[in-house]
Structure formats: structure tokens, C-alpha cells
Amino acid sequence: RKESWVNWDPIEQTVLANEQVVDGCGWRSGAPIERRLLSQWFLKISKYSDDLLQAIEGLDRWPERVRLMQQNWIGRSEGALIKFQLKNPRTLNLEIKHIEVFTTRPDTLFGASFIAVSAQHSLALLVAEQDKKASEFLSKCNAYGTSEAAIEKAEKRGYNTGLTAMHPLSNGEELPVYIANFVLMDYGTGAIFGCPAHDQRDLDFALKYDLPVRAVVRPSDVETEFVVSDTAYTGPGVLINSGDWNGLSIDAGKREAIRAIEACGVGTSQVTYRLRDWGVSRQRYWGCPIPVIHCPNCKTVPVPEAELPVTLPVDVDFDEPGNPLDRHPSWKHVSCPKCGNNAIRETDTFDTFFESSWYFARFTDPTSKDGFSREAADYWLPVDQYIGGVEHAVLHLLYSRFFARALSEVGYFDLDEPFSGLMTQGMVCHQSFKDQDGNWLFPDQVTKTKEEFVTVDTGETVIAGRVEKMSKS
């Protein structure tokens, strides 16, 4: 359990998955979502990142499209971790002395012109405590969703903290430190060095805030002076304006950069993954209760095995927004299994993908008194042929692969991959229609005139929506 930035719907008073945020608003309430720091339960899927990635090669009966989607989702990146020493942290009484940056392009280090940290970075939070304008900027950043897509769509904005960081290899060069709305806290360290000449996002930011743009890579066939104006150069080439590295290829430059920062004691090579731990907390009634009790004395205590499963109460109130389990008069009030004092049940429920991530094992013996039968699972698994939608490529299918490894590790069975073969069938799709009150209409209730769609029976104008997939129900 740890604190995490989440999408918060202020009307429904619940956390929303990134997929439930549409154009910055809750998919159902329509309210602008907020970014909040809340305590959430996680499953440590990141522990298996490399294994999950390497094993994709053996899934030779899976569609190449799904394998590629999982590879990209896990997202292995090789690069360097570099420390940028803050020159003047005492001006804001900061305890932080340096900023760590992960980069996949250490070869462009001499092209750095600024440092940018996420709005959730510890440095940004400390600055905001002492700087009202910085605090206001963070509030604006928190109005965006937490997904990469939401952040990517937003206009690139930054706040100059007034701090500077020393370039680790360029003697005396200082880089201004910004808080930027496009830096993801969930990737790397939540901080970047901006190299505008070779990253379009950094270039847009630099042009907006009048920061230097220094090319340090040029195409191999360009002999004249190479200048970047409004389009970043991201292709192959050789290093320039980089001291002793001039003339090196990009790959050789990366190796030399890592050697240099390691020799100076300001960095090291590092491999990182895009895959993050799976946040499984939901403020919904219909999920499986998380079997945990919170005691003032004993802190977090698991529900004893003899008391499992924890069942949901039937007499719940859905008339108010938020989690009805929080409002239930008796269900959440229990005795601590350790000390017997008054305690409170965990009222968050599991993400529904939690249960579907291991049902393949349950299906081998649905009558078992346990979660599943080890004997039956060993006999039947892995599943020979799985048929399911491609929309599950980086959710259910990846989670099931993780569950197979985790359950094997704790001794429930001996299985690496749950599904030997996978076929992703197509979907039945059709344009969607609503009446003027926002109610869905069947296609046979709608007809098209020369200019618009109207209802068959009354001729009322119909709102034509996007093409939707058919519901499973």
C-alpha cells in the first residue's frame, strides 16, 4: 500500500482508470477530473517486468500484434541515471541537493539547456510550499488526467523555480530548473534534462520559454553547420558540439557518455521499464472486498484465513455519490484479529481485473472448496487455445501472465504462461445513436434523410455518435 496520484471524479467521489477519463472529464458524470494523491493498494507486477518481456518470444501461437503491444507496454529502456547538482538550494531552504534524471539519450548531454521536473516530484512539492505561484501552477497541472495521452494533449507549460542545476560535464554551465506539466512522474525519476534540438516536446517548450537550442547530433551527410529551428532532429548521425565526443556515432556517444559520468561519480548506466505496479484499489461496491483490517494499535492486519471470503453487505445505499461501503453503519466496524480492539475494514474493493486474472485456474475444478485445485490445475493448464478481444492485450492478458508467475512463486502451481495459444476475434461494430434526451436508440429505430438522422416513429432529430463495439451483454 502506498500513495499514488490518481484520477478523481469529484461528483462520483471515486477513482477513475485512465480509460474512464474522456477529454479530461469523467466518462459518466462529465465532471472535470482532478489529480489527487491517495493511499492505494498495489500488486508488484513490476518485479516480473523482465521475465514477462523475455517470455513473449516463446508465445509463438499469439498474434504478433498482441505480442508487440505487450512489449511496448512493458517498455524496456536502456540508458543512464545522471545526477545534476543544485547550485543554490539554500535560497529556498531545500533539503534536496541534486536532481536525478533518467535518459535514454546520454549522448545528447551537451545539448541540455534546462531541467524539468514533474508537478508531483518532491522538489516541485517543496518549492510549492514556499512559493504561492508555484503552488497555483501545480493546481493547474493537477486538473489534467494522469494518463500519458491526457498529458500529451495538454499545452506544454512550465514554471521557473528560480533554481539552477550544474551541468555535470560542462564546467560552470548552469541549467534553469522548471516544473513542467508534460513530465511524467511514473516514468524514470520524474525529471528530465531538456535537449530541445533532438526532442520535439523539449523544443516546443524551449521555444515557448526562450531557452537555448543547441544541436549536438547532425546527419552524417551534412558537412556544413547544422542548425535546428522548429523541427527537432531525431534521426541517425554523428555528434557535434560535444567536445571530445565530436564525430562519434550515437551509439558510441552513449557508451562514452556513460563512461564519463561514471568516471566523474555523477551517474551510471541503468535499465528501466515503463510497466508500473498495478493499482488495484477501487471505491466501488461491486468489487471483491480487499481482505484487510486497519487497527489503531496493530496498523494493517490481514483478515484471518478462516474468515475468508469477506462478503459484501446487501443493505447498501446507492443514493449518494462515493463508496457505499464507507457509509455502511455496521459492515466496516470489526474487531482486530490481533488485539481484539475496535478496528475498521478496508472499504476499497479490488479492480475487477483482479478476479479475471486467475479464473482460468478456477475453471479446472469449479467445485473445489479452495480457490482452485492444485491437482486439476496441474493436469489441465496451460489453456491450449484462448479466444478473446484484442482490447485485453495489455490488461487482462498481461495480468493473467503475471498471476501465473506470482501463484507459481508462492507454490499454488507450477506454471509460467497461462495461455499457449491466443486468437483475437473481430468485433461487431455499428454507428451509435441517441435521442435529444441522451437515451440510446437501436439502429432500427433510426432512419436517414438527406440531411440528418431521425427517429422512424416521430421524425425527431437523432444525435449520431461514433462507431461503437457491441456490448458483451
For the regions a language model picked out, list residue spans one by one.
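Conserved phosphate/anionic-ligand binding catalytic regions in large, soluble enzymes, centered on
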Residues: 1, 99-121, 278, 284-285, ...
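Catalytic alpha/beta core of large soluble enzyme barrels
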Residues: 121-220, 225-226, 231-232
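Cytochrome P450 core scaffold surrounding the K-helix E-X-X-R motif
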Residues: 113, 123-128, 366-373
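Conserved oxyanion/phosphate-binding beta-strand-loop segments in alpha/beta enzyme cores
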Residues: 61-64, 139-178, 340-375
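Conserved, non-catalytic sequence blocks in retroelement Pol enzymes and Pol-derived host proteins
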Residues: 71-73, 153-156, 392
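Residue patterns forming the tRNA-binding/recognition surfaces of aminoacyl-tRNA synthetases
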Residues: 1-94, 98-99, 122, 191-309, ...
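Short loop/turn motifs at secondary-structure junctions and domain boundaries
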Residues: 155-159, 284-285, 452-454
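Conserved active-site neighborhood of enzyme catalytic/cofactor-binding cores
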Residues: 25-26, 139, 187-218, 288-296, ...
